[in-house]
Amino acid sequence: NNTAMQKTVFTKEQRAIHKLIVDSIGMSDIGLFDGKMGIILSLITYSRNTKHKAIEEVADFLMNQVLNNMTNISPLSFSNGLTGIGWGIEYLIQKGYMPGCGADICSEIDKKLMSCDIRRVDDLSLEHGIYGWLHYIVAHIQGANRCGKQVFDRMYIIDLISKINEY
């Protein structure tokens, strides 16, 4: 019977989404550039644009994995560390894709970031340095303002501005 053997044809976009989902299964990296947070952003955007609820559920499942494992990673880098994950969380909240307040969800990230003496950081790169941290810090302050919260103390902001002014 030929109708029972019909082949499903997927678009390039659908194949890419399916590959992301399969790749995420055994993935240990939860970061933004090469990990689960980056995949979550792709899946959420796709699911909202296509109204594909199952894809959104996969993204929610992955987000729970990220949130449960955030405290297990220590790099502050934007590419594969905490500031990239925090930026992703803020992006999802501010776009209305995720409920909550980033100030509450990312408080541990903020503590780790403020415990680092920014005056001694020499890396300015997006991937691992201050430029990446700034992406998180600016988005996070915007999100915190919407929640009526303050996320960084005055001294940290003064040191950050001072460091930026060096360059």
Where are these regions (language model features)?
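Long, compositionally biased, intrinsically disordered segments
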Residues: M5-F10, N72-S74, L92, R120-D122
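Solvent-exposed loop and edge beta-strand segments that line ligand/cofactor-binding
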Residues: H18-K36, N68-L82, I118-I130, Y167
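Eukaryote-skewed repeat-based solenoidal scaffolds used as protein-protein interaction platforms
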Residues: M98-Y167
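Alpha-helical solenoid scaffolds in eukaryotic proteins
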Residues: R15-D23, F61-N69, E108-C116, D159, ...
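A broadly used, surface-exposed interaction patch
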Residues: M63-D104
